[in-house]
Structure formats: structure tokens, C-alpha cells
Design a protein with these regions (language model features):
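Active-site Tyr-X1-5-Lys
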Residues: 1, 19-26
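C-terminal substrate-binding subdomain of Rossmann-fold SDR/epimerase-dehydratase oxidoreductases
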Residues: 24-167
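Flexible, glycine-rich beta-alpha linker
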Residues: 1-16, 38
């Protein structure tokens, strides 16, 4: 199981980052439903590394490593903090808080990482701020700098692989 995943290229409906990007690129106000809800926000490449570490551990020791594993960020942060970071990185945008009782979500979603940290020795490389910055940069480079999505994605993969000592 993973925390809330962030990264460029997600255009899903009713999701915080995609909704923010849509509002930023159309100069509309971002509607924020639950500003004080907290989540762990994990860059899209992080759990992939975690899955590879787990697969390597499972090889030959399936019984020991065949249970549930959580891959999450090193900290949790509120929705409003994510919104403010996204606006800071995009540079010009605005938001409005609108209470919506029809859309029911859990207030705090936090994964317990102790087992993963102890037995897999896995931790996220990027902190939440860096994850959000890279995510917003992906969209900014595509929307404002006219870069190809594949080019920005490949740059981010290369950078991550170097940091993770995977290359």
C-alpha cells in the first residue's frame, strides 16, 4: 500500500494536484474542499523503488516477506500546506476554501512505516516539499516551457535514479 502519490501527468478528476494544475493553467480559483485534512504525499518514483527492494527481499525468502507492506512519506502534511506549496512553485494562482459535505473523505490518512523501515530499510528519498516542487515543475515545464511530457519525465527519472544509486 502506498501513500498519496504525486507526480506529473496525472489528470484525474477530483484530485488535489490535477485540480490545482487545471486552475493554474486556466487562471481560475482553485477550490479546496478539506484544507485541514492530512496525508502522506509520496513522489511517484518512490514506491517503485520500494517495490523493487521488496521483490529482491522476497526472492528466496517468500515466507518472511509475503505480508502487507506500507510505502509512505517520511511525514504528513495538510491539504492547505500542499496548496500553498503548489501556488508558491507555480508563482501566480489563488485558492478558495469551500466546505463540501457531499464528498466524504477520511480526515487523516497516515501509513505506519515502521515495519518497512525496519525490515526493508526503505525510506523515501524526497521529502514532501521536494515531491510537490518536482510535481509542479513537471506540469510547469509542459504547460509553460513547452517541453514534451516524455522529456520532463525522463529528466526526473534520471535525477531520481542517480540519487537512489540505481544507475
Amino acid at each position: 500500500r502506498t501513500a498519496n502519490i504525486v507526480g506529473g501527468g496525472d489528470w484525474s478528476y477530483k484530485r488535489l494536484i490535477p485540480d490545482a494544475i487545471k486552475s493554474f493553467t486556466t487562471n481560475k480559483t482553485l477550490i479546496v474542499r478539506n484544507p485541514n485534512f492530512t496525508r502522506q504525499w509520496l513522489f511517484v518514483l518512490e514506491p517503485l523503488k520500494g517495490y523493487l527492494v521488496l521483490a529482491k527481499k522476497q526472492y528466496g525468502k517468500l515466507n518472511k516477506f509475503s505480508s502487507n507492506w506500507n510505502f509512505g512519506a517520511n511525514s504528513e502534511i495538510s491539504v492547505i500546506e500542499i496548496v500553498k506549496l503548489a501556488i508558491k512553485f507555480w508563482e501566480k494562482s489563488k485558492y478558495k476554501i469551500v466546505k463540501n459535505k457531499k464528498f466524504i473523505e477520511q480526515k487523516n490518512i497516515l501509513l505506519n512505516m515502521s515495519k518497512t523501515n525496519k525490515y526493508l530499510k526503505w525510506r523515501a528519498i524526497y521529502n514532501t516539499k521536494k515531491s510537490i516542487r518536482l510535481t509542479i515543475k513537471w506540469y510547469f515545464d509542459v504547460a509553460k516551457n513547452n517541453k514534451k511530457p516524455s522529456e520532463v519525465t525522463n529528466e526526473q527519472i534520471e535525477s531520481y535514479m542517480k540519487l537512489a544509486n540505481l544507475k
